[in-house]
């Protein structure tokens, strides 16, 4: 009987020891992410984003990415191409205004995805503090709600051996429009981790964005 009671009292302690220390995990992942970003700062790359409306390709944009001397990520659209035929006269002006509105919307959607892709130390700690965390088969998975705005949700998958991101899935809002997104990561042969693809769905606009990061090149020292 005494042994049974002792075992019962030990159960909570055993469960607590098995739990993941989320604060330490957040710090470890942030440390790995910061070290990886330092290596990524030596690269310049481009993002090709194809914009579909009702499953029809309407727009393609090319954006260049680089880090400035302050360590901040900078973006610059270097090319855009619309698949719609240009109209003349007043219709052409209306079409041009609509195209500008679409470009603005697409830009805001892609900026939203970057907010989930590149998180600060404080944001990561806050996220893991409220997240449900599990680990299985060498992969850490964490899910939390109300990350940036009320009602949003983010799930991250992290390689336990390196503490580097494998993917991020989120649902959020762009204005009042719902947005679902997924960012996937890959590694160079050197081990540097980087965002490879981004998929965004905006059902209110019947819009989908397929983006791929490409043409990575290291700066000349």
List each model region and its residues:
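Solvent-exposed N-terminal domain segments of exported/luminal and surface proteins
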Residues: 36-86
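Extracytoplasmic
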Residues: 40-42, 60, 128, 137, ...
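Short, exposed beta-strand/loop patches in secreted or surface proteins that constitute
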Residues: 64-66, 126-135, 156, 185-187
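Gly/Pro-enriched, hydrophobic low-complexity segments
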Residues: 137-221
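Hydrophobic h-region of N-terminal signal peptides that target proteins for export
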Residues: 9-17
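Flexible, processing/modification-adjacent segments and terminal tails
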Residues: 20-21, 81-152, 172-174
């Amino acid at each position: 009987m005494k042994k049974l009671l002792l075992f019962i009292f030990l159960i909570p302690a055993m469960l607590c020891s098995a739990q993941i220390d989320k604060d330490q995990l957040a710090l470890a992942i942030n440390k790995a992410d910061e070290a990886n970003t330092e290596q990524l700062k030596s690269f310049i790359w481009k993002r090709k984003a194809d914009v579909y409306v009702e499953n029809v390709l309407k727009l393609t944009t090319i954006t260049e990415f680089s880090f400035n001397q302050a360590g901040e990520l900078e973006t610059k659209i270097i090319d855009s191409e619309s698949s719609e035929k240009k109209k003349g006269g007043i219709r052409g002006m209306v079409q041009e205004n609509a195209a500008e509105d679409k470009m603005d919307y697409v830009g805001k959607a892609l900026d939203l995805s970057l907010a989930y892709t590149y998180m600060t130390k404080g944001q990561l700690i806050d996220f893991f503090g409220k997240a449900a965390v599990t680990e299985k088969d060498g992969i850490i998975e964490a899910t939390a709600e109300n990350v940036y705005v009320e009602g949003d949700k983010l799930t991250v998958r992290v390689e336990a051996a390196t503490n580097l991101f494998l993917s991020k899935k989120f649902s959020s809002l762009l204005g009042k429009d719902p947005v679902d997104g997924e960012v996937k990561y890959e590694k160079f042969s050197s081990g540097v981790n980087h965002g490879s693809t981004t998929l965004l769905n905006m059902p209110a606009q019947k819009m989908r964005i397929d983006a791929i990061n490409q043409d990575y090149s290291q700066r000349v020292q």
